C-alpha cells in the first residue's frame, strides 16, 4: 500500500485540506527549500523516531537536506528539491554522490518504501482520525 497523504490533515471524509504547503512540487515558484523541509518534517514526525532539517549541510533556495531515523532505527539523509525527495545517504548528514536513488513526489511515498513501521503508524493514525470523524458525525 502506497500512502500519499497525511492522515492528520484530513479535514472531512470527502477530502483533504486545501492550500497545504505540500500539495505537490510542480508549477511552484522558487521556494526557500528550508521552509519546505520544515513543513515536511512537521508532517511526518509522528511516524518516525527522529527527523530534522540538517544544520551542517548547505540549504539554499533550491535544495535542503533532511535527516530521518525510521522506527526500524535506519538512518537516512534525504535531499529535497523541486523534483521531490530522494535518499542521498545512509546516515545523518551524509551525502554519497555516487548513490543512485529515485525521486519521490511526496515524503509519504518515500517513507512508504523505506519503513514498514511508517506504513503501520500512518495507517493507525488514519484509522484514528476516521473514527474520530465518525464519532463527531454521530453526535
Curated annotation (Swiss-Prot):
One of its GO terms (cellular component) is cytoplasm. The record marks 130 as: Required for GSK3B interaction. Keywords: Cytoplasm, Nucleus. The keyword DNA-binding does not apply. Phosphorylated by GSK3B. SUPFAM superfamilies: Hypothetical protein c14orf129, hspc210 (SSF103107). Residues 1-22 are annotated as: Disordered. Gene3D superfamilies: Hypothetical protein (hspc210). Belongs to the GSKIP family. A-kinase anchoring protein for GSK3B and PKA that regulates or facilitates their kinase activity towards their targets. The ternary complex enhances Wnt-induced signaling by facilitating the GSK3B- and PKA-induced phosphorylation of beta-catenin leading to beta-catenin degradation and stabilization respectively. Upon cAMP activation, the ternary complex contributes to neuroprotection against oxidative stress-induced apoptosis by facilitating the PKA-induced phosphorylation of DML1 and PKA-induced inactivation of GSK3B. This is GSK3-beta interaction protein. It comes from Macaca fascicularis. The gene is GSKIP.
